[in-house]
Amino acid sequence: MPDWFLYFVSILSKSWVFMLSPALFIFFIFKDYLAFRFALLTVAFFFFGGITASSLREFDGIYIYRYLVWAATDIIWMALIAYWGIKDKVYLWQCVIGQLVVIGAPILQLFRLVDRHLWDLAYSTIIYKTLMPFINIGTVIVCYLPLIMLFAKKSNTPSKIESAPPSK
C-alpha cells in the first residue's frame, strides 16, 4: 500500500472520537436524543478502543487476545445498539443500518485470528487493513445519518408563504 494511504488511515483511526464530536453537539442542541444516544455510545466504544489498543498490543505478544477483545467489543456494541433499538432508545432504522455496517468487524477480527495461527494467508493482512477503516468510516456515517435526514426534512417542508391558500 502507498505510504500516503497508510498515513491517512492512521490519522483517521486516531480521530474517530473527534469526527463524531460535532454530531454529539448538534444532536444535543436539536434535542434529538435518539441520535445523540447512538452517537454517544459509538464515541464511548471508539474511545475505549483507542485507550486500550496500545496496552492490549503490548500485553498480547502472541496475537490472540487482541482480536478476541476487539471482536467482543464490536459484538457488545451491536448488542447494546440492538437492545436500545428494541426499547426505542435509538432510531430503529439507524440501529439496523449500524448492525449491517458493523457485522463485518467481528467477522474480520476472528478471520484475522484464525489466519495468523492456522492458515497464514498472504492476502488477509491487506483485506484486514483495508476493510476495517471502511467499517469505521461507515459507522461514523451512520452516526451522521439522522442529521442528514433532519436537513432533508427541513428543506422539504414548505414555507408559510408557499403553503398559504391563493388570494382572490
Which residues are covered by each model-predicted region?
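Hydrophobic transmembrane alpha-helical segments in integral membrane proteins
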Residues: 1-21, 129-136
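Short, amphipathic, aromatic/basic-enriched membrane-interface segments that mark the entry/exit
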Residues: 4-13, 34-38, 65-66
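Hydrophobic cores of alpha-helical transmembrane segments in multi-pass inner/ER membrane proteins
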Residues: 16-24, 74-83, 135-150
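Membrane-interfacial loop-to-transmembrane alpha-helix junctions, especially the N-terminal start
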Residues: 31-43, 91-100
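A generic, lipid-embedded transmembrane alpha helix
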Residues: 37-58
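Juxtamembrane "helix-exit" motif on the non-cytosolic side of transmembrane helices
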Residues: 51-60, 83, 110-121
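Alpha-helical transmembrane-segment detector that highlights a single hydrophobic TM helix
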Residues: 58-90
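C-terminal membrane-adjacent module
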Residues: 102-168
